[in-house]
């Protein structure tokens, strides 16, 4: 491996660098050859430290070549496969006749068009590989020559074709096509086409011929659309390709103008591969210039219709993808016209040449001006409201419930206060003819809460009597002792937890019921009380603090308790 063995090194290593290379090998601990170390040493700009670091991360079996070796080697893409028929191989003929490694590399990457087209015989190993792998035997002439060249004819078993017959037919086809193209002054394709390899498709996938002919790695651009559309023109490129691939004569081959040279190669390969896979088709090609006769029960579409339909769908699909930007031209948000129910223009598909038998296709390529006008008809309001009309985003609801007449601006978005359930106190004005008098005697045990008024202590009065008592008591306490009766004076206030008012002497269970009626006015409908509600309240036991002396103003809050009782009776009459 080293250069000290004598003559094994292909690169001359200076004598003063051999010790340095030996030290680098000892430092790395890997058995790299002197050529590898010297190549890394040159790449590292003669820095031994960087060379050692690179060799530490370099595998021992990794092949390191110098720049001089790389220049001598032919430019062959290593990572590109051969495809279905080995369409692409761009190495020269001398590289095929080189060492065994190069020959195996060529065998992996597919057939070399130039060398296999010109060779009259092949080795036995290559013939065996061609028989087992039918992809390499179906190769036509060189891919760089724009023609419809075929070196095979469809037969029942293409593996029985001899190598000499293939080579002679390919040589004859190359000479005829070269002469015809020189007579028409058609130049060869640009070299940038040959720098890309075809996209490979499996045998079990039925791919359109337009994709097989023009699809290469990196070919998705505007030129690809033009090439496919030109091959589908009024000159009938696919018809001429099919005729020339079956050998219809020299005159017909000369009268078939095509601009895409790969079309004939792929079409011939597709026809041959189709016949080799489907053994049911018995195609007789004994006579030159005869059309293929199908002896089978299978229904095969006509030859002239299938390529047209496939090429039409292919061309229109790519024209939509690359030829125009509508119907998604309005900020990328407007859907297509066919998706929203707009009429789709199908005249463009009908006016194309060779499309009389094809069904109407919904995907039609619109011109840029027509599609932009159609998309502009949709009314798009960019200054619309964020919320629907029935949504009020500025209505704030506080954590606790607040009645409508007081802070209505937080509860309703329109700012109009809602009507309160209770009538105002000014409307209930009546002449005061009775006043509550403090009782010095003990109150009766059967009706303890009505002991402040001797008129109502005996029995339940009528509705008019209660209304008059309610009005006169409110008027009397508002005028005489308003400072001591704040809770009763503002009787129209709706009781709720916001005010935190603790009335003197009120029972604990009853104000909760009143607060529920008044505070939850807008949320709950008031229920109609029973007729015997007053008798129910009279049977309640008295609170403990009512047994105190009656000389103090403790007895007055009992009148405040009597007022809501009259209000309940008013609800029954007004309802």
From Swiss-Prot:
Compositional bias (Polar residues): 90-102, 115-138, 161-171
Keyword annotations of the record: Nucleus
Sequence ranges of Basic and acidic residues compositional bias: 268-281
Main localization category: nucleus
The organism's place on the tree of life at top rank: Eukaryota
Region (Disordered): 66-171, 229-296
Tissue: Expressed in roots, leaves, stems and flowers.
An annotated GO cellular component: nucleus
Subcellular location: Nucleus
Annotated family: Belongs to the GIP1 family.
Cited function: May act as a transcriptional coactivator of LOB domain-containing proteins.
Protein name in the entry: GBF-interacting protein 1-like
Organism the protein comes from: Arabidopsis thaliana (Mouse-ear cress)
Primary gene name: GIP1L
């Amino acid at each position: 491996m080293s250069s000290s063995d004598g003559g094994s090194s292909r690169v001359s290593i200076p004598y003063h660098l051999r010790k340095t290379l030996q030290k680098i090998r000892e430092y790395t601990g890997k058995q790299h050859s002197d050529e590898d170390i010297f190549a890394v040493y040159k790449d590292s700009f003669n820095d031994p430290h960087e060379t050692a670091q690179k060799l530490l991360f370099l595998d021992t079996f990794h092949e390191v070549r110098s720049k001089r070796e790389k220049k001598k080697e032919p430019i062959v893409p290593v990572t590109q496969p051969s495809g279905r028929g080995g369409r692409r191989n761009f190495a020269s003929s001398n590289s095929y006749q080189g060492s065994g490694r190069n020959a195996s590399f060529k065998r992996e990457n597919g057939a070399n068009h130039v060398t296999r087209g010109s060779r009259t015989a092949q080795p036995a190993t290559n013939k065996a590989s061609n028989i087992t792998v039918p992809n390499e035997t179906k190769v036509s002439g060189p891919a760089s020559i724009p023609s419809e060249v075929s070196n095979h004819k469809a037969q029942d078993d293409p593996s029985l074709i001899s190598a000499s017959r293939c080579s002679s037919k390919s040589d004859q086809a190359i000479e005829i096509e070269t002469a015809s193209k020189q007579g028409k002054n058609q130049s060869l394709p640009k070299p940038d086409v040959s720098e890309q390899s075809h996209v490979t498709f499996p045998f079990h996938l039925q791919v359109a011929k337009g994709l097989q002919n023009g699809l290469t790695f990196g070919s998705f651009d505007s030129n690809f659309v033009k090439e496919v559309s030109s091959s589908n023109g009024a000159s009938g490129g696919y018809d001429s390709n099919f005729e020339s691939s079956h050998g219809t004569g020299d005159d017909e081959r000369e009268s078939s103008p095509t601009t895409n040279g790969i079309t004939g190669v792929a079409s011939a390969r597709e026809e041959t591969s189709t016949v080799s896979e489907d053994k049911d088709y018995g195609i007789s090609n004994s006579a030159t210039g005869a059309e293929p006769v199908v002896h089978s029960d299978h229904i095969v579409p006509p030859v002239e219709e299938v390529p047209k339909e496939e090429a039409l769908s292919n061309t229109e699909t790519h024209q939509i993808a690359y030829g125009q930007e509508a119907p998604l031209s309005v900020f990328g948000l407007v859907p297509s016209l066919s998706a929203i129910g707009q009429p789709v223009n199908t005249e463009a598909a009908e006016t194309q040449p060779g499309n009389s038998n094809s069904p109407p296709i919904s995907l039609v390529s619109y011109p840029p001006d027509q599609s932009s006008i159609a998309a502009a008809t949709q009314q798009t309001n960019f200054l619309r409201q964020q919320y629907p009309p029935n949504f009020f985003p500025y209505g704030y609801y506080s954590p606790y419930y607040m009645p409508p007449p007081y802070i209505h601006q937080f509860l309703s978005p329109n700012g109009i206060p809602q009507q309160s359930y209770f009538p105002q106190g000014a409307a209930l004005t009546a002449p005061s003819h009775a006043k509550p008098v403090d009782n010095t005697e003990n109150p009766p045990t059967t009706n303890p809460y009505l002991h402040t008024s001797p008129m109502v202590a005996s029995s339940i009065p009528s509705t008019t009597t209660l209304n008059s008592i309610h009005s006169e008591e409110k008027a009397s306490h508002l005028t005489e002792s308003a400072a001591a009766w704040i809770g009763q004076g503002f009787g129209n206030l709706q009781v709720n937890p916001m005010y935190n008012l603790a009335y003197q002497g009120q029972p604990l269970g009853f104000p909760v019921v009143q607060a529920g009626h008044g505070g939850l006015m807008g949320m709950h409908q008031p229920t109609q009380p029973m007729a015997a509600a007053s008798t129910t309240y009279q049977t309640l036991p008295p609170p403990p603090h009512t047994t105190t002396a009656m000389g103090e103003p403790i007895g007055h809050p009992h009148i405040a308790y009597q007022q809501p009782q009259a209000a309940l009776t008013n609800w029954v009459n007004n309802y």
